[in-house]
């Protein structure tokens, strides 16, 4: 039978659903909200791929340079919500040059042209200017949600444009941004008829806000569920705001400090007593311990408590947390100490996530391994940990691994580099190996302390589901990196700093990088020659190098043996970016 006959036979044998119009499949795809499920289904045939493209309503771009904005808009024309991430994660620790890039403007301009019905925008670690915010306000007539996380480049003038122009805004969520205060009363730009706000978070804003305007806004937005205040809100005004919004589910208190007065305490206690729906509480910066009992009436209902900026310590903090028996998420400073975590262990057996931050990265420290061991033993639902401390033992890590094999995220940050087991003086290889061998569902891991290549051999062999790995001051040869890149079959992001890893494992495992989202290496043993070879070998990867500002010579003039201070490699379908600053060079 010839080719034509084969095609005819196949067409005749095709199931009847093959002839259904694309509109039917587009409707069917609306029942697959998960991106992984949609991607798997779209690979079945060309009509399903076409239907998935046309019906997609949400788009997440993990690297703003992985695709060209206008190509993304053209490929997915019906998007209503977009999330775009910019600078590498190590930007949070000051390792990425401030002028690296990640401008939001190209994405907003492309969205304005191709997604006129866009309702939501989220940017993380990107440069968002006032002009960007003005374009958002002017371009999308039904815009409802703006989330900016760890962004910079804008001011309160841009926020004023959002307030004045986005008449259907439901969420304005500003987290950990650097915002210039232009002394503009931007909250007053919300029209008096505006009532749609559900989330308002301006906790990162440094300047003053007009309290009267804020109170009027909160009063008329009856569906407001989340309110996070900055540290300029006086404590007596917090009580007034709570009386006007007793329906709040999440509250960021702001500074929470004032001279103690019994009448103010009574007002706060009464205000919190009226918040019957409050489930998530944060803030309490510089909290005065005498006011903490005002929280007691809401403790039983709290599922999330973020005190990562609260410097309160001692019995007052422990009394407070011991009343929060339904907590699922707890963020605190190490001022809680081991005794406080023992109370958490006995009181909060529904805990799922624990983060403990250092109060003084250079101080003596208040926390040991004991607190984490206690929590792991008593909280059966615990699956995510970020723990800063100054000492650890292999025995403790092995115990934690046995107690909680259900960990999906384990990030241990021992503040002093190359710190061994403080009892045996041995490397912490055995402890971290126990974590990856016991916790088979682990997706995110950060390791620290004195570690040899043996721990990387264990990670490469056992961490099959690991997606993100952070390594600092660890390993003793190229073998460590080789074990990671030749194993860890699900790895998407790898970030490394101050490790003795060089060219050989990078080039030997170059193909692995095409299956990953990104690789960051800084203060390692890489050379320019290896980066050149990698770029030639893997043309679909963008290979960026960053050296000290004083070393901005053209790459062509530098020999292969030139050390590379910082390397960032990522997969892209857009080709080399065109906005590289002087401190960044593409190989």
UniProtKB/Swiss-Prot annotation:
Gene3D superfamilies: 1.20.1280.50, Ribonuclease Inhibitor. Signal peptide: none annotated. Residues 92-93, 358-363, 413-417, 472-473 are annotated as: Interaction with auxin-responsive proteins. One of its GO terms (cellular component) is SCF ubiquitin ligase complex. GO terms for molecular function: auxin binding; inositol hexakisphosphate binding. 1D-myo-inositol hexakisphosphate binds at residues 85, 124-125, 355, 409-411, 444, 492-493, 517. Keywords: Auxin signaling pathway, Nucleus, Ubl conjugation pathway. PANTHER family: F-BOX/TPR REPEAT PROTEIN POF3, PROTEIN TRANSPORT INHIBITOR RESPONSE 1. The F-box is necessary for the interaction with SKP1. Part of a SCF (SKP1-cullin-F-box) protein ligase complex. May interact with auxin and auxin-responsive proteins. This is Transport inhibitor response 1-like protein Os05g0150500.
